[in-house]
């Protein structure tokens, strides 16, 4: 009888919760209001800061409260080119400048935007990672929708009053920098709360994993498992529809022949 595998020791547990005690806060657009729907609201970028576990930098933006005396402090994801001391404008009448937030229906075709709302008022959920952006493709005035191209290349149709920030998310090319040493990877994954290092099953002893043991590193038996297998056996391809290389697909130039 072997030991319990790593996935068994983790247990079912609760829903994943991010370690938010060292994070700057929630980065999102202003809550939509009357002044942003019919005019513009001006904000000042106070500082640009690093958020642990996030690739893109964040900007602390201060707005003057249009309803009462006081200041509203917001946390925005930085667009590339945004700087400390810059004024940004949010609203339907905002101009097309880097960092401004306006409805995508007001953006000309071909405009590069980021932190796009999927539904009006959700404060931005599309194209938020470092270096990401979406492109405005076309507008439909009849049903008031706008079609955009997502970072994945897929196309999506949104309501034209969904807001977006003009520009590209800062921090592009972050993943191209080599890690070079294990200490950098250790701190990187610790900030993101990811298990690291991840040891392969074939590198373990047979007491630790179903794929362990042997005179050389090999599984030694089929890795496909049925869905009803007990937890100690579930290591490999669970209830796989198919395995192996996909053969017989369309090749380049096959359509021309």
Swiss-Prot record:
Residues 207-257 are annotated as: Disordered. Gene3D superfamilies: 2.30.30.30, Nucleic acid-binding proteins, Ribosomal protein L2, domain 3. GO terms for molecular function: RNA binding; structural constituent of ribosome. It is found in: Cytoplasm. The keyword Ribosomal protein applies. InterPro entries: NA-bd_OB-fold (IPR012340), Rib_uL2_dom2 (IPR014722), Ribosomal_uL2 (IPR002171), Ribosomal_uL2_arc_euk (IPR023672), Ribosomal_uL2_C (IPR022669), Ribosomal_uL2_CS (IPR022671), Ribosomal_uL2_dom3 (IPR014726), Ribosomal_uL2_RNA-bd_dom (IPR022666). Its main location: cytoplasm. HAMAP family: Ribosomal_uL2_A. Belongs to the universal ribosomal protein uL2 family. Component of the large ribosomal subunit. This is Large ribosomal subunit protein uL2.
């Amino acid at each position: 009888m072997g030991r319990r595998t790593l996935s068994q020791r983790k247990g079912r547990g609760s829903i994943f919760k991010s370690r938010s005690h060292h994070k700057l806060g929630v980065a999102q657009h202003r809550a939509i209001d009357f002044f942003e729907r019919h005019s513009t609201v001006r904000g000042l970028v106070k500082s640009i800061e690093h958020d642990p576990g996030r690739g893109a930098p964040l900007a602390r933006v201060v707005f003057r409260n249009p309803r009462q005396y006081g200041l509203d402090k917001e946390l925005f994801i930085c667009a590339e080119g945004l700087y400390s001391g810059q004024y940004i404008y949010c609203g339907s009448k905002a101009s097309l400048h880097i960092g401004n937030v306006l409805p995508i229906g007001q953006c000309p075709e071909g405009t590069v935007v980021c932190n796009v709302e999927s539904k009006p008022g959700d404060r931005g959920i599309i194209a938020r990672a470092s270096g990401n952006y979406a492109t405005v493709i076309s507008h439909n005035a009849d049903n008031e929708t706008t079609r955009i191209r997502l970072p994945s290349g897929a196309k999506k149709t949104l309501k034209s009053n969904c807001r977006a920030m003009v520009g590209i998310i800062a921090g592009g090319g972050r993943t191209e920098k080599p890690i070079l040493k294990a200490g950098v990877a250790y701190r990187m994954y610790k900030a993101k709360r990811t298990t690291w290092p991840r040891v392969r099953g074939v590198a373990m002893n047979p007491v630790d994993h179903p794929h362990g043991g042997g005179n050389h590193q090999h599984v030694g038996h089929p890795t496909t498992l049925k869905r009803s297998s007990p937890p100690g056996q579930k290591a490999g391809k669970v209830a796989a529809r198919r395995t192996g290389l996909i053969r017989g697909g369309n090749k380049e130039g096959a359509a021309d022949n």
